[in-house]
Amino acid sequence: MKVAILSGSVYGTAEEVARHAERQLKIAGLEAWHKSNMSLEELLAFAPDAFLTVTSTTGMGELPDNLLPLYSEIRDRLPAWSGKPAAVLALGDSSYDTFCGGGELMRELYAELGLREVVEMLRLDSSETVTPETDAEPWLQAFVAALKA
């Protein structure tokens, strides 16, 4: 199964988590692909069977600048991905009202596209974790199990 990993990061933590997720999915026998700043054309060329987004939140609950162009392009073109499995791993700081707002935007987009959320969005709180890659592993295992089910 081909899994595309979309990522958006302000300070690099979400990128690290996305790279870690790519390694974990490959170890599990999936064909995972992650590229920072990917274009919609690159994503379509990969022809994913499933989607994983790893993103932080910036500003007033917005997506980071490096994910926003892809998000906008997907919203404009609405590719035919209905029924495909997807999940979102969001990083944020719970001291803000817009905690994990970037992840919520991706969940809404996935719902608009008709993608199936196979595991509930994981919200990693930067005020509670210093090892988000490790903290994400049980959730990633659940994501892999859902994809293989």
Regions found by a protein language model. Name each.
Residues 42-46:
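Short glycine-biased active-site loop of nucleotidyltransferases that positions the nucleotide triphosphate
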Residues 35-41:
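Short acidic loop-to-helix transition motifs that present clustered carboxylates
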